[in-house]
Amino acid sequence: MPSTMNYEQARFNMIEQQIRPWEVLDNQVLSLLAVVKREDFVPLAHKSLAFVDMEIPLPPQADPSQCMLAPKIEARILQDLNVQKHEKVLEIGTGSGYMAALLGHRAQQVISLEIEPTLAQSARHNLQKAGVYNVEVLQLDGSALLAPGAAEKAGVQGPFDAIVLSGSVAEVPTQLLALLKVGGRLSAIVGDEPMMRATLVTRTGEQAFGSTEAWDTVAPRLLHFPVPSTFSF
């Protein structure tokens, strides 16, 4: 296992060789990546891969979608959202808790939803160990929020300044847009393999939304989010 010194060198290399070349140039984001110890959120079996440009599987691995996204993806999402200190954020797909920790350092409050009980418990432990106390991890299927009134019943109290989907969906879930404040942003990786689009939707008015598709990537599906029907003849 690498020494502490090697971890710091690996972290520096990750930022300089992976993150910056991917047009992540926000100094606040780069500084945060240098401070939050990614290796502390990586499962022990994969600790040596903490700074590698790849998705890292998370236990219990019942589904391949349970993983940490590649560092450059997390960094680019963080830059796109531009979360401010006074803002309230919802994340769907806690995983290891690393992205929630990054968001917690930027926001006033973060609510993060994780469908897998073991991961939710592990993420809480990781966040506490990292000294991140403004993140609440709820063991909840994020797709359940798509039903009318489901968010309030589940204790997910909006509206939110930012919503992050830490995984991909076939299309932007319009039901989640209702949880945004005016001026709020939703970040999602949208589409199908082999090419998906990082999509940022901004609520510009009570009934008005704007959308940008800034970059291409691929990410595992969030579980149970709807897939449009396709017909074959």
State each model region's role:
Residues 1-90, 98-101, 106, 119-129, ...:
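Class I SAM-dependent transferase core
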Residues 78-209:
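Conserved nucleotide-cofactor-binding alpha/beta core module
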Residues 191, 195-233:
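Core SAM-dependent methyltransferase catalytic element
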